[in-house]
Amino acid sequence: DSIIHHLQYLNAGFLAMDPSSGALRAWVGGIDHDFYQFDHVNSNTKRQVGSIFKPIVAAMALERGVSPCSLISASRPTYTDKEGVEWTPRNTQNDYQVEYTMRGTLAYSVNTVSAKLIQLAGVQPTISLARAMGIKSDMPEVPSIALGASSISLIEMTTVFACFANHGVAISPYYIRSIHDNDGKVFDNFKSEEPSKRVLSEETSELMISMLKGVVNEGTAGRLRYMYGVYNDIAGKTGTTQSNADGWFMAMTPNLVIGTWVGADDPRIRFRRTDLGQGSSTALPITAAFFKQVNKDESFKSITDAKFPKLTTDLQGRLDCDLYELSEDLIVEIEKSIFQRDSLIQADTSVKPPETFLQTIYKRKLKIRATQERKDSIASALEILEGG
């Protein structure tokens, strides 16, 4: 009974890294090293990474010339690998009729579109990029790696996101900065053993940072803002494995990159529902608590107040699109479903069916349209006043 009891404990790994140097600022291998002597950070501890692998796919697609504003259908593709095994990805939401841009694909973590992006980017080039960015673990040459089917360590994935924050220059982490005595006499200084190397264009890195900020501001990591009140300039990506065994959240600021993993020591132990086991519910709150703590400390102002550089006009233009588009036929279907839902609520106020994902993104579109119409009306009124 005792073994079963402790196997069900959730564990966690947490790592903070300086993206420009690779210096490690914080390392938490688990919840209690005296009892659970297992380090969930180091390179020997590998877990399926889920959707935190998707930014690597998107970056490779950008490098291959795919526009971040290109619309890609969320319909379900079927792929056959070299062994003849078929694979058909699916989404957590019933959104297969929606067309997503790369921005929306990352913000809403759309599996089917990510699977299509790796076909445009190339599976082997994507693996090569992942290796160049810092992943040394095995990655099978199959399309499903786009959704994080590979098992990779937390320190490797944090190194990957450090590459994005470091403008596309890959670094390797190091643990000890210097050795000195109590009087301050320095005996030795250390730095990363491997030289830094550019593996992504600066443009691609800046586009990726902007799109991953969208994940935090209006995507799957949105609760970092509205639930936990963390408003630092943060780009990030949530991740959840298919079996709900692993929850991830990767967060980037200009001067600090943070990787967080949550799960049981035994990957066979998992959450029964995705809403319980997803990275935004398990790993993200730990990152939020960290930021809320360091935000109180004046000595960390260089980290907490740092802002990512603004995009150039050209790069802003390349991202001048919405997250998704809805066809007229789909809009009609959504409007019917909203009418039916509202009618049910009016008929029985004790019954309030939850709003579907499609209804939510449709209403978002309406708000955007209304805001734009107000802006246009104000602009027209000002023109009339100036002309008069």
Where in this protein do the model-derived segments appear?
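A penicillin-recognizing enzyme superfamily signal
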Residues: 1-18, 27, 34-43, 53, ...
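Active-site SXXK
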Residues: 21-22, 46-74, 105, 160-164, ...
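Mid-domain, small-residue-enriched loop/turn segments at the edges of structured enzyme/sensor domains
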Residues: 86-91, 122-161, 168, 172-175
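C-terminal substrate/ligand-recognition segments
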Residues: 7-20, 24, 59, 63, ...
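Periplasmic/cell-envelope proteins involved in peptidoglycan metabolism and beta-lactam response
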Residues: 1-52, 66-70, 124-130, 142, ...
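Structured segments of extracytoplasmic/periplasmic soluble domains
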Residues: 27, 31, 59, 63-65, ...
